[in-house]
Amino acid sequence: MIDINSSSSSSSSNNNNSNNNNNNNNNNNSNVFEINSSIKPYFTCIVFVISLIFICSSKNIVTKHLPIGRAGSSIIGATLMVYFGIIQPKEIGSVINWDTIILLMSMMMLSNYMEQANIWGMASKILLWKCKSTSIFMVRVCLISSIMSSILTNDTVCVTLTPIVISACKSTNLTFFPFLMAIATSANIGSSALPVGNPQNMIIATAGGLNFFNFFKVSIVSSILGVCLNTILLLLYFKKDLKNLNSNFNQLIETVNPKVEEIDNNHHDDDGANNQSKNEKEMENINKEVEEEQHNNDDDDDDGFNENKNNNNNGGHAILLVASSMDSIDLSDCSIINKDKKKKENFIEIYFNSKEKSIETIVNIIKLIFKFRVAIILTLVLIGFFIGMHMGFTVLFGVSILMICERKDITDIINSVDWELLLFFSGLFVLVEGFDRQFEKEAWTILEPFVPIDSTHLNVLKIFIFSILILVLCNILGNVPLVLSLSPRLLEALAPDFTWILLAFVSTVAGNLTLVGSVANLIVAEKSKSYHEIGFLEYLKFGVPSTILVILIGVPIVVLIGK
């Protein structure tokens, strides 16, 4: 006899074995290469440190022999983390912060549309328009750099504004270094005002779930004061250089200002000519109406004169008086009717004319909206931020509207996106996550005592030490890697909003400490190397006092407003 139970059990065991084999195969596929758990921390530390050396180094012996760039270093490090089982391949989708990637990509697209709308052309005119001294020129550079950085990210502003300022300095024989420092330092401080000002702010806002308006109301005050203080320090530090106002600078201003004024005058003349033509047309219409009324009155008088003449030729005075009175009444009624008809005709004509004018006005408004579509979309995007809409997709929605309005192939827009930067951040998310999984306890154990988490009982010493640690670590590890490392721990600790905003402010301003502290600094140095090569110590002499003073003033404001 055949034992059914044994056969069923054997079949079930076979199924279990096959399932286990499938699971093992799946695990082998997901874990590309599994290394020993005891080796993982050492391997992770080596990969992370070497990757950071390549990422943070601008030009040294290592990068000269292997110039793979930041994106290459990030991707190689992330690949090693995944290939050797530190992070599973199926986890990559959850490790990468897609909100930040989408926000970065969409802001780059919007920035390209703003460049097409000649926003930077207007900025260059503002820089030199009626500029009477180099000090005023310095202040304008600081203001434009900081304001534009809060909206378009500091990296984008440094890429675009640096050639404009270099061209102005070259034409006027001004020294380059003071104004290059103004671009870099003002861009970093100004970018701290909004969550879209720089990549680390975007990461903090998306990871911490911060409300745009709450971030803005806390950071805007410290950012404005920081920009003002930094501008004053620039004017004092470069006082001797700014005094060298030469004749070439005045000559340039004299040649630039008349062109701007000529454009304004032409614009006003065109408006005046249009207004004058409109007034002449209105006067002609009024004169025609007056002539028609006089002509009608003359016709009425002629009719009355003929009637009286006919009445005098008839006999019977009483009958003639009655008849003449009756005729005069009838004729007056007819004249009233004729006038009413003409009034109705004039009313209809005026109605249709006003209707045509209203249609013309609507068309002009539509044309005006289309002309300033980029500025309108930018304003609506900022409004969307303030009311709490998703930042990345809000910008992408605005960009989509501009794509429809342009009705052009978007190849140029796609090419304007810095895909290398997006790949760099994607790899960095994976790289930092791998390091964080192996050393989260050790790193957090060192930092946790100094992290201001309790918003009800503020410890001044703890806030001070936390700010100093962030300042130093940002210039060693980089602001973005540090923010990525701290974000998961702050989420677990349920850190209040002011802790996140404090991290955003200090990590952003910390970029002004050294030349390699911020990507924006490196961009300015790279763009200006043909005219002035910024030295590390040369930058450090101004960067250290400026950064420390801005943090000393800005941190208390962030804590007091944000708590």
UniProtKB/Swiss-Prot annotation:
UniProt keyword annotation of Transmembrane present: yes
Pfam families reported for this sequence: CitMHS
GO cellular component, one term: plasma membrane
Sequence intervals crossing the membrane: 35-55, 67-87, 91-111, 176-196, 218-238, 376-396, 413-433, 463-483, 500-520, 542-562
UniProt-recorded Gene Ontology molecular function terms: arsenite transmembrane transporter activity; ATPase-coupled arsenite transmembrane transporter activity
InterPro entries attached to this UniProt entry: Arsenical_pump_ArsB (IPR000802), Cit_transptr-like_dom (IPR004680)
Signal peptide stretch: none
Keywords attached to this entry: Cell membrane, Coiled coil, Membrane, Transmembrane, Transmembrane helix, Transport
Membrane topology annotation: Multi-pass membrane protein
Domain of life: Eukaryota
Biased composition (Basic and acidic residues): 262-271
Compartments it resides in: Cell membrane
Record region (Disordered): 1-26, 262-284
Chief site of localization: membrane
Coiled coil: 273-303
Alphabetical list of PANTHER family matching this protein: TRANSPORTER ARSB-RELATED (PTHR43302:SF5)
Family: Belongs to the CitM (TC 2.A.11) transporter family.
Name of the molecule in the record: Putative transporter arsB
Species this chain originates from: Dictyostelium discoideum
